[in-house]
Amino acid sequence: LFKDIDIPSFTLNEIITAKPENLNIKTPLLHFSEYLKKGYYPFSKEDGFDEKLRQIINITLENDIPVYAEMSAAMGRKFKQLMMIISKSVPFKPNMSKLAEMIGTGRNQMHDYLLYIEEAGMIAQLRDDTSGIRGLGKVEKVYLDNTNLIHSLAEDDVNVGNLRETFFLNQMRVNNHVVSSSETDFKIGEFSFEIGGRTKGNRQIQNLGNAYIVKDDIEFSSDNIIPLWWFGLNY
């Protein structure tokens, strides 16, 4: 969009059957790297992007959520601290007691706090495919909503595994029901996806059907290996 490149969208089935292979895009990995840092928001090309994003984060966490949930502004600062922890971490299953201790609040409210932040578009919670309280599955991992937020909050301490998984979830949840998997990072319907870098092996999926390795830092597909950037073409 911001590079004036006309690219069609592809369904998940088209992506896993390598339909994007025929795209004629020069230096896609360079564009992809730029997108991860500054491409998600509509004001990405405007001057002062970094400051504008920080303002959005601060207003959302320190004003919008506390006003909506009738909390003190001090809770907003704790929410930002929580997001900074998530931004720098390997994707993890939330330990509510530990998170509450780290930000100095009560454990019993952590589920509600995370849900407020998720509904505000600041984080994404990956759930299993069971229906639990409120009709939602059990939370297995917590991510920031998008990779621009990671770069803004983590600055020079970005965890690349976190960045890759955040991108995949952010892009694929728009048109698909993405859930956690006990064997791989993500599952969408009958398909399983394990995310990694260029040297990622296929040991983890070798005994699974309809399973794919999604690799960063590659331009083209091969067998059951799919470039990560292709999943940004789903809508």
Task: For each feature predicted by the language model, list its residue ranges.
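Conserved P-loop NTPase motor "coupling/switch" region that bridges the ATPase
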Residues: 1-21
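Amphipathic alpha-helical "lid/sensor" segments that cap RecA-like P-loop NTPase cores
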Residues: 16-58
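Short glycine/proline-enriched coil/turn segments at helix->beta-strand junctions
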Residues: 104, 173-177, 188-191, 205-212
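Conserved catalytic cores of phosphodiester-cleaving nucleases, focusing on short active-site segments
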Residues: 168, 172, 186-201
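Catalytic cores of nucleic-acid endonucleases
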Residues: 181-183, 196-235
